[in-house]
Amino acid sequence: IGIFFNFFINWITNVKNKFARKVLEFFTGIDKRAILPKYNKETFANYFQKFKKNILPKHKERKVVIYSTCFVNFNKKKTGEAALKVLHHNNVEVEHSYAGCCGMPYLEQADLDQVTKQAELVSRELIKYVEKGYKVVTLTASCGLMLKFEWPLLMPNDGIIKKLSQNTLDIDEYVMDIANKEGLVDGLKEIDGGVTVHNACHARAQNMGNKARDMLKLIPNIKLDVVERCAGHGGT
């Protein structure tokens, strides 16, 4: 619904639309000051299908399936576009899967039954790719944490969940794996100005190190600042 009516929903949820936000706050309890994510004009899933039709097939030794997550699929398609282009440029075969939410919002509300349902739904789809030799790449730190750690903690006897966890990587983690083994394709260029990267709590909880920082340091002469403080996700 958010995608189909994206213009209208983005308009009424804009903090500058004070009247609409007051009404929204009254009926939903969402603070009128909260900046809400905007909806894409199309899902990342739709974009991926068009991208795939327009690329030349070639043999690739590396294979990944992007789990785009709710946020990228519906709200931040450009993140998925960037990841897809970087992976394809570095000769990685890419597929896409989005069977549903990872369950993080339910976990934060202690609805463990619904988290379990989401884990079963998504894992049964992603495992099909893992069994074909694909790695699962996540584009959102919170969702990566769910697949790697929270699902296995909640369902320790589920073999599919365990195998999926062992074959899931954050996008920054995967790019650094390429850089450290085969090396990235030549062509990284300097960028104007500096870059600030936020090392999210859910990224740190994955015990992979600050891979976003390490990846950005590969850019020649990069001016990089790292923010370690919590963004307040737990307060949402």
Show which residues each predicted segment covers.
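Iron-sulfur cluster-binding electron-transfer modules in prokaryotic oxidoreductases
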Residues: 1-236
